Regions:
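Conserved alpha/beta catalytic core and glycan-binding cleft of carbohydrate-active enzymes
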Residues: 129-131, 146-265
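Substrate-binding/active-site clefts of carbohydrate-active enzymes
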Residues: 1-163
Length: 265
């Protein structure tokens, strides 16, 4: 019922959240337990495939919101103690748990993790015919601090040795594999620090994402409508926020997402 309306209004792409199975509905699908399973809350795998096929028939691409930045802590239905080894996929010690998300952090330096996550990308592309991915929480992957409590004001803040080289390697490999499986696939990075080169081509020294999200725009928009009367809106400031991007990176600009509508950021 929704797809015809989307097509009629001229949209050619949709993003679907909470696809991967997750035990807690309130996590919005971001505490993933079964990375290769379509969430049973919303229907069967065949029904998801039918939805994607129907969208394609209407000329609508379908992007999956994929979560490779962390995993749920649950051990019964998750990877937290898979095969009796709590560290098979995750960092040991103090780096094991994410300090803000109550979840586990993948150790991207392990071959098992790289193979697991790369095959996960390939699986959703081939089995369900998704047209690409929006990678969630990329900032958390890039930095040992997860980007928490840090200000990124100049290029020195991006290249000071606090970056997780293994995670950067994984993201680059993921983009390479995804575009080998489907050269027309779209990859989008949700990233708040402004890491240079994220959406630049791999051959140019970038990470290979097709787009990065302009996350400054919704923050600016929410602040404006909440704190300023209409007469105080400055067109020059609005123009600068919308056009503030690097020339070598394509950017997806937007005014609102689930972060604003549901989470309340």
């Amino acid at each position: 019922k929704i797809l015809p309306r989307i097509a009629e209004e001229g949209y050619n792409c949709i993003q679907i959240m909470a696809i991967q199975e997750h035990p807690y509905y309130g996590s919005f699908g971001y505490h993933v337990s079964s990375f290769f399973a379509a969430s049973s809350r919303f229907g069967t795998p065949d029904e998801l495939k039918a939805l994607i096929d129907a969208a394609h028939e209407m000329g609508i691409a379908v992007i999956m919101d994929i979560v490779h930045s962390h995993a749920v802590k649950n051990e019964v239905e998750g990877l937290g103690n898979f095969a009796g080894d709590p560290n098979q996929y995750f960092y040991p010690g103090v780096r094991r748990e994410h300090p803000a998300w109550d979840s586990l952090c993948f150790d991207y330096g392990k071959n098992e993790v790289i193979h697991f996550l790369l095959s996960n990308c390939k699986y959703w592309l081939e089995e369900y015919k998704f047209d690409g991915f929006r990678f969630d929480g990329v900032t958390s992957m890039l930095y040992y601090s997860h980007g928490l409590g840090e200000a990124f004001c100049n290029y020195g803040d991006y290249f000071n040795g606090h970056q997780d080289d293994n995670a950067i390697c994984y993201l680059t490999l993921a983009n390479e594999v995804i575009h080998q499986v489907n050269p027309k696939a779209i990859t989008i990075a949700e990233e708040v620090s402004g890491m240079p080169g994220l959406a630049a081509k791999i051959e140019d020294g970038g990470y290979g994402f097709d787009y990065r999200m302009a996350m400054n725009i919704p923050d600016y928009w929410i602040k404006t409508i909440k704190e300023k009367i209409d007469e105080d809106w400055k067109p020059s400031s609005m123009f600068w926020e919308v056009t503030n991007r690097r020339q070598d990176e394509k950017t997806i600009s937007y005014a609102e997402s689930h972060d604003q509508a549901l989470v309340g950021d």
